[in-house]
Amino acid sequence: MDSNIKQPRLITFYAATGHLMMHMFAAFYFVIVLAIEDDWNFSYDELINLWLLGSLLVGLGSIPAGWLSDRWSRSGMLAIMFIGLGTSSILCGFSNNKFSLMINLSALGLFCSIYHPAGISWVVNLSLIHI
């Protein structure tokens, strides 16, 4: 296969995978909380509020993530996002109290914030090279 064709396909694959993971990981908690509600004997509202800081960090973290991706490395930031999403989601699974779950969900939100500023600019810059 010609490398000129292979490169854009890899870019598309990694960009689509990153985008899918970012949105899926941010949305999983709303389903998982239904099982946690019974196991931990907390109300749905109490458990949903644990995602408040994480959801704020999805938006607020995008500003420094974009700044860092512009000055350092877009692909490096995406690698950090993939590793961070995996690590923080595993830590969420090991959480056994509300405080640790809130901290780990906040980390998940922070790593989710990386995709849009780093991933979109990465795709645009690389697509301009291959036009």
Model regions and ranges:
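Conserved MFS/SLC helix-loop-helix module at the cytosolic interface between two early adjacent transmembrane helices
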Residues: L60-N96
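Short hydrophobic/aromatic, small-residue-rich stretches within specific transmembrane helices
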Residues: I48-S55
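Paired small-residue
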Residues: S88, F99-A107
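Small-residue-mediated transmembrane helix hinge/kink sites in multi-pass secondary transporters
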Residues: L34, I63-W67, I120-S121
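Cytoplasmic helix-loop-helix junction between adjacent transmembrane helices
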Residues: N104-I129
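Residue-level signature of mid-helix packing/kink "hotspots" within the transmembrane helices
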Residues: A27, S55-I63
